[in-house]
From Swiss-Prot:
Organism of this sequence: Hyphomonas neptunium (strain ATCC 15444)
GO MF annotation list: adenylate kinase activity; ATP binding
LID: annotated span: 126-136
UniProt xrefs under PROSITE patterns: ADENYLATE_KINASE
Pathway: Purine metabolism; AMP biosynthesis via salvage pathway; AMP from ADP: step 1/1
Protein name, per record: Adenylate kinase
C-alpha cells in the first residue's frame, strides 16, 4: 500500500505516520526528515537546503524526487510506504506516479488532514518552543503555510478525481485522528 498523508505544516502528519510505522510496519518517507538530515550534514546540498528552508521556500522537485527515489529503492521490500510531506506540487505528484508505475505500483490512498490556521499556529509555536526547529519560527511558518495553499492545495481535486482522497478532521486528539485514519485504511483495503 502506498499512502500519502497530506495537509498543511503542523497538521500532525509526522505524528500519524510514526504511529502507522509502529502498528503496520510501513516505511515512512518524510521529505521533511530527509531534508533536515541533508541540512544537518553540512554538505553543499545541505547548505542549499538550509538556505531554502530558512526562507520558508520549497526545495526543488529535482532534489526531493531524487531523495524519494533513493528511499524507494533502498526499502523495496516494505509492505507499504507512507509519503509524508510529498508530493507538494503537481510536478512532484506526476513524478511520484512515474516512480511508482516503474515499480508496478500506484498511490492507493491520500489522507488529507484538515486543521484550521489558528490551530496550526498554536501547534507550530509550541513545537518551536519545545524542539527549536528552525522552520517553525512564526515568520518562516507563515511563508510555509502560504506555499502550502499556493502549491500543494491544488493536489486535492486531482486526487479526488482519482477516487483515492479521504478527508479527515485533524483537530481532534491524536487518538481520534488515528481512529479516522484506521477507518479510511480499512475502507480502502
Amino acid at each position: 500500500m502506498n499512502l500519502i498523508l497530506f495537509g498543511p505544516p503542523a497538521a500532525g502528519k509526522g505524528t500519524q505516520a510514526k504511529r502507522l510505522v509502529e502498528q503496520r510496519g510501513f516505511v515512512q518517507l518524510s521529505t521533511g526528515d530527509m531534508l533536515r538530515a541533508a541540512r544537518a550534514s553540512g554538505s553543499e546540498l545541505g547548505q542549499r537546503v538550509a538556505k531554502i528552508m530558512d526562507e520558508g521556500g520549497l526545495v526543488s522537485d529535482e532534489i526531493v524526487i531524487a531523495l524519494i527515489e533513493e528511499q524507494l529503492t533502498v526499502q523495496a521490500g516494505a509492505p507499504g510506504f507512507i509519503f509524508d510531506g510529498f508530493p507538494r506540487t503537481i510536478g512532484q505528484a506526476e513524478a511520484l506516479d512515474s516512480l511508482l508505475e516503474s515499480r508496478e505500483s500506484k498511490v492507493d490512498l491520500v489522507i488529507r488532514m484538515i486543521v484550521d490556521d489558528t490551530r496550526l499556529l498554536e501547534r507550530v509555536t509550541k513545537r518551536f518552543e519545545e524542539q527549536g526547529r528552525a522552520d517553525d519560527n512564526p515568520a518562516t511558518f507563515s511563508r510555509r503555510l502560504e506555499r502550502y495553499y499556493e502549491d500543494t492545495a491544488p493536489l486535492v481535486p486531482m486526487y479526488a478525481e482519482r477516487g483515492v482522497l479521504v478527508e479527515i478532521d485533524g483537530m481532534g486528539s491524536i487518538e481520534a485522528v488515528s481512529a479516522e485514519i484506521d477507518a479510511a485504511l480499512k475502507q480502502s483495503a
